[in-house]
């Protein structure tokens, strides 16, 4: 696996920024036990590191439809047959919302600036 310094080599500044935000998202998701979306972010990170021009579109696909990345809330716990919020759920979701919004903005800007079919 590449270190943060190695991952940015050969990437545009916009792709480096997207890589950084998506990496933060992946860590936040994994830290809360959210495997599905963490794996999605890992695939986008790998695509960015490989120079795949479709990486922004791969990320943007996570945002559409029911059950999408937009619908995710962190800090939930289900134990002993009961749903409850973790003590840090508010902070987790504030951070998730900020990163999720920034990732969408960056991916959209990169996609829109890239010539070719979508």
Feature map (PLM): residue ranges:
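Short terminal alpha-helical segments
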Residues: 2-44, 100-115
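Amphipathic alpha-helical binding modules
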Residues: 71-118
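Intrinsic-disorder-associated interaction segments
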Residues: 7, 11-14, 18, 49-52, ...
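Amphipathic alpha-helical interaction modules
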Residues: 32-80
């Amino acid at each position: 696996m590449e270190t943060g310094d190695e991952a940015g080599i050969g990437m545009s500044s916009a792709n480096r920024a997207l890589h950084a935000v998506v990496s933060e998202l992946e860590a936040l998701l994994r830290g809360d036990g959210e495997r599905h979306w963490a794996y999605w972010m890992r695939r986008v990170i790998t695509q960015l590191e490989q120079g795949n021009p479709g990486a922004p579109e791969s990320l943007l696909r996570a945002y559409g439809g029911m059950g999408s990345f937009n619908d995710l809330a962190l800090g939930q716990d289900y134990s002993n047959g009961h749903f409850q919020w973790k003590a840090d759920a508010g902070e987790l979701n504030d951070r998730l919302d900020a990163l999720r919004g920034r990732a969408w903005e960056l991916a959209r800007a990169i996609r829109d600036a890239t010539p070719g079919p979508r």
